[in-house]
């Protein structure tokens, strides 16, 4: 039976009604600081925690509940006579319910206006300690860490008592919360180091919060959820949906890739970029002198595959572009913004998901789940550090610009990957092949014609160069590093093709 509850909450939503309910059930309430004042002002009978501990708050509120009279009251095992005799001797009254939510560290750590020292003050100490004590004692103590659980506990109390299963569930939510909270603090502290060189943390603790339950995963028989980082900003975290159906698992994955491609280009330099994605694979990408031209050129890359795909822009979509977009079936259009006229046009397609991104891509690490483990690597952000022309013929300035465009696109295609480029259009994309010549032939056949070619990895044989010669490719960019590099260089010289080595591979599995 619940006789005494301790309430200490930062978020006051719903607590007044719940406290009134507890009072109606003759539950004595103990509270701290701001919560005590809030309940008192609203005529809720409440005891200040200092009356229980016999000690006033100290160190600017850093120490309030870190006291044996609080934790002894929570941790005492009710069916252990020794425990109960001990707390009785010390004048400690058991606490049967703990209601705590934490300082808003998740929110404050992302606030660029706060200094490091100011963020430190939002690290909660007493709150997690009380929650963990109560969760450990879940058989005897009901612990609530989520405002959404007030109604659950209330309904069970009205029927008699909170069930063992519910108490265990609430305890599991506590450890889920405190582990995420500590992970966020650890990540914040580690990322604030002046140098991380030769420094590694022994555990990978990443803090993600449930954003929404998805209808299903990659396929209808797979359950799925979407979680977002509690510490990092990111384009897939704070976007705004302006129209259309709810997003699916596949939508979010494809949208992420589509946006990353266009954000390789700088709108401020009038690099108006557009990309099209289907099944996590680029089927078109282009630059244009306007948003409309960028889209039309992307569509021209592969008018068949773009159907039912995701289209992304690094700039604002205008009315003229919107009128072209609605001519075909698309799942998503994501852009920096939309003019009011463009949005009105796009909304004529009620199921078309229209997404406005607010943050540029911010990924620093890449995670791959394997059975029983997690592979962690740096995100592939390096393009060209120091390229080298290895052939007799050198690329023209325009060819070089197209080659760099190609590298920015090919890194997002599944390996083995080849992209054939003409006038800043990815006219042919060969990807996901188990050998490079197949990827090359696929890209060349799709392109029909092209000027330059980009490869995500080196050529093991000269066959790729020979195939390029048949399609009149003028220049090639690739990492180099094969034992047979010289054979490919010789082939380029024979065919009058320029070739550049970047020294940077872009495998994508």
UniProtKB/Swiss-Prot annotation:
Pathway: Purine metabolism; IMP biosynthesis via de novo pathway; 5-formamido-1-(5-phospho-D-ribosyl)imidazole-4-carboxamide from 5-amino-1-(5-phospho-D-ribosyl)imidazole-4-carboxamide (10-formyl THF route): step 1/1; Purine metabolism; IMP biosynthesis via de novo pathway; IMP from 5-formamido-1-(5-phospho-D-ribosyl)imidazole-4-carboxamide: step 1/1. One of its GO terms (biological process) is 'de novo' IMP biosynthetic process. This is Bifunctional purine biosynthesis protein PurH. SMART domains: AICARFT_IMPCHas, MGS. It catalyses: (6R)-10-formyltetrahydrofolate + 5-amino-1-(5-phospho-beta-D-ribosyl)imidazole-4-carboxamide = 5-formamido-1-(5-phospho-D-ribosyl)imidazole-4-carboxamide + (6S)-5,6,7,8-tetrahydrofolate; IMP + H2O = 5-formamido-1-(5-phospho-D-ribosyl)imidazole-4-carboxamide. One of its GO terms (cellular component) is cytosol. The keyword DNA-binding does not apply. The gene is purH. NCBIfam families: PRK00881.1, purH. SUPFAM superfamilies: Cytidine deaminase-like, Methylglyoxal synthase-like. One of its GO terms (molecular function) is phosphoribosylaminoimidazolecarboxamide formyltransferase activity.
